[in-house]
């Protein structure tokens, strides 16, 4: 049933993923501005990945040829994989915190004060803030749930792209 839906409406799937990303970003803003949780550098990178997936899937859901929605879908798939990687790294830091947990620089401080070649490794090394678990739902931290969401989006995109109808080769029709 789900695979039939994926076959019939790839643009609907892309629109649904875009809406889910926007909902997750809105929930992140709620946690930050209403609940008072400050995002760590890895959380901010995950937000950027969500924004990218939302934009690419949103563009893919608009009218256009098959090639366009497939292009946007592939880009969204790559960003979903990147977001899953960052969320997995943050989950690892939460499960196995570093010996010395310090509150490192904030994300924007790292980007502004260090060359990008030094800032990127610092972000992925994490800080004491990245290992902290400030909120849980059903036993999972925000990073755990973010990982699950990124993996589900990546799997849905992958299935959608793999099941996309292929154009006939060589000019022969199957009929």
Curated annotation (Swiss-Prot):
Any GO CC annotation of this UniProt entry: plasma membrane
Stretches in topological domain Periplasmic: 31-48, 89-144
Listed InterPro entries: DiS_bond_form_DsbB/BdbC, Disulphide_bond_form_DsbB, DsbB, DsbB-like_sf
Native source species: Paracidovorax citrulli (strain AAC00-1) (Acidovorax citrulli)
Disulfide-bond pairs as recorded: 40-43, 103-130
GO terms classed as biological process: protein folding
Sequence ranges on the Cytoplasmic membrane side: 1-13, 66-70, 164-175
Cellular compartment(s): Cell inner membrane
Main location: membrane
HAMAP family tied to this protein: DsbB
Family statement drawn from the similarity comment of this UniProt entry: Belongs to the DsbB family.
Transmembrane domains' residue ranges: 14-30, 49-65, 71-88, 145-163
Entry keyword Coiled coil: no
Alphabetized UniProt keyword annotations: Cell inner membrane, Cell membrane, Chaperone, Disulfide bond, Electron transport, Membrane, Oxidoreductase, Redox-active center, Transmembrane, Transmembrane helix, Transport
Task performed by this protein: Required for disulfide bond formation in some periplasmic proteins. Acts by oxidizing the DsbA protein.
Bilayer topology annotation: Multi-pass membrane protein
Protein name: Disulfide bond formation protein B
Molecular function per GO: electron transfer activity; protein-disulfide reductase activity
Gene3D superfamilies reported for this sequence: DsbB-like
SUPFAM superfamilies the UniProt entry points to: DsbB-like
């Amino acid at each position: 049933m789900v695979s039939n839906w994926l076959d019939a409406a790839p643009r609907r799937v892309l629109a649904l993923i875009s809406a889910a990303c926007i909902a997750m970003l809105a929930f992140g803003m709620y946690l930050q501005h209403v609940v008072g949780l400050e995002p760590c550098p890895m959380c901010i990178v995950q937000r950027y990945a969500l924004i990218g997936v939302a934009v690419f899937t949103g563009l893919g859901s608009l009218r256009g040829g098959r090639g366009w929605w497939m292009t946007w879908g592939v880009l969204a798939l790559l960003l979903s994989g990147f977001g899953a990687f960052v969320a997995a790294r943050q989950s690892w830091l939460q499960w196995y915190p570093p010996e010395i947990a310090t509150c490192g620089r904030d994300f924007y401080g790292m980007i502004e004060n260090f060359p990008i070649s030094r800032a990127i490794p610092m972000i992925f090394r994490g800080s004491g803030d990245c290992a902290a678990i400030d909120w849980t739902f059903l036993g999972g931290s925000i990073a755990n749930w973010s990982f699950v969401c990124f993996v589900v989006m990546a799997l849905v995109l992958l299935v959608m792209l793999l099941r996309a109808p292929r154009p006939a080769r060589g000019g022969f029709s199957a009929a």
